[in-house]
């Protein structure tokens, strides 16, 4: 897959194009230019390190939405075995913006649930761009209650711009579905591990993100509203999105300082989409450790900690 570069990555894109051209020349001729290719590769890596070491919140928001980032089904394929997808909410329909089912994690049976976006236009429309309707959240809750019934740990992956705000979704009880998930997740009698892998958009993310451990990938975001949405409300223009992103505190390191996130999972150089394999290794190492810890904690303590976590959200201070 040809890499897609964001606007602030254009200097990296130019170097990558030069490297590709030199590789083509080397393949088509007897000239040895491997030293020059190696020099440009090092220059590209150094430039990438420099750019990504000082990303603004607005740029991190762009990375979190990168079209080539790994999605929930990519994590399921890499981290789990024997995945059996389960469908439908048993009330209205099957929402393809939420995927989930039974799987094995290191041989242990678990329930995995997550948002799913699409890669191409047809799939994006089918998945509703990762924005669940009420039936998606009710499907997620049905799966998590099934996990509770059989004593299976729950692992969730969060990546959504937010819950779908359409008329039909509101008519079918979007806010009720989200609220019910929050209520039920606080008392689900099995370990719950949550990982934000891309966008963590408001209640649409929180509805599957109440857990014993909440993780974020290094360049993911988590916020009550998108920077563009916030800017449109406060300044009546989306052009102020960068200012909104700065004020909202949407980044993983900022949220960890506020004790809203347990672990910030390091991403490969250039973001998770640049090296799926390394990303999966990093995520798996964290989930293995947390699952072991969660299963060693008495259930009453686990539930108490989880409830205290959600009740601590929304702290403020007066200057």
From Swiss-Prot:
Record-linked InterPro entries: Acetyl_CoA_COase_a_su, ClpP/crotonase-like_dom_sf, COA_CT_C
Family: Belongs to the AccA family.
TM helices/strands, residue ranges: none
Main function: Component of the acetyl coenzyme A carboxylase (ACC) complex. First, biotin carboxylase catalyzes the carboxylation of biotin on its carrier protein (BCCP) and then the CO(2) group is transferred by the carboxyltransferase to acetyl-CoA to form malonyl-CoA.
Gene Ontology terms: cellular component: acetyl-CoA carboxylase complex
GO biological process per UniProt: fatty acid biosynthetic process; malonyl-CoA biosynthetic process
Protein known as: Acetyl-coenzyme A carboxylase carboxyl transferase subunit alpha
Protein's organism: Neisseria meningitidis serogroup A / serotype 4A (strain DSM 15465 / Z2491)
Residue ranges of every copy of the CoA carboxyltransferase C-terminal domain listed in the record: 39-293
């Amino acid at each position: 897959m040809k890499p897609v570069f964001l606007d602030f990555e254009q200097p990296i894109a130019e170097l990558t194009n030069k490297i590709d051209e030199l590789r083509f020349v080397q393949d088509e001729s007897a000239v040895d230019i491997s030293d020059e290719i190696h020099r440009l590769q090092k220059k590209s890596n150094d430039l990438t390190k420099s750019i990504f070491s000082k990303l603004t919140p607005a740029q991190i928001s762009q990375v979190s939405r990168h079209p080539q980032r790994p999605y929930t089904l990519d994590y399921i394929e890499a981290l789990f075995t024997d995945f059996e997808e389960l469908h439908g909410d048993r009330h209205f329909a099957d929402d393809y913006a939420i995927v989930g089912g039974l799987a094995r994690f290191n041989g242990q049976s678990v329930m995995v649930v997550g948002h799913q976006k699409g890669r191409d236009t047809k799939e994006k429309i089918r998945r509703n761009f990762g924005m669940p309707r009420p039936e998606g959240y009710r499907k997620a809750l049905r799966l998590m209650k099934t996990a509770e019934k059989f004593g299976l740990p729950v692992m969730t992956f969060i990546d959504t711009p937010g819950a779908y705000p359409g008329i039909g979704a509101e008519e079918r009880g979007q806010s009720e579905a989200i609220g019910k998930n929050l209520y039920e997740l606080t008392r689900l009698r099995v370990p719950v591990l949550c990982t934000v892998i891309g966008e963590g958009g408001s209640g649409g993310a929180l509805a599957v993100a109440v857990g014993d451990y909440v993780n974020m990938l290094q360049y993911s975001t988590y916020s009550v509203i998108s920077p563009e949405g916030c800017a449109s409300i406060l300044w009546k223009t989306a052009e102020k999105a960068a200012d909104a992103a700065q004020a909202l505190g949407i980044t993983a390191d900022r949220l960890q300082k506020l004790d809203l996130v347990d672990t910030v999972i390091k991403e490969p150089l250039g973001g998770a989409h640049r090296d799926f394999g390394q990303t999966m290794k990093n995520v798996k190492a964290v989930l293995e450790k947390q699952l072991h810890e969660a299963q060693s904690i008495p259930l009453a303590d686990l539930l108490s900690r989880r409830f205290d976590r959600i009740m601590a959200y929304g702290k403020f201070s007066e200057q």
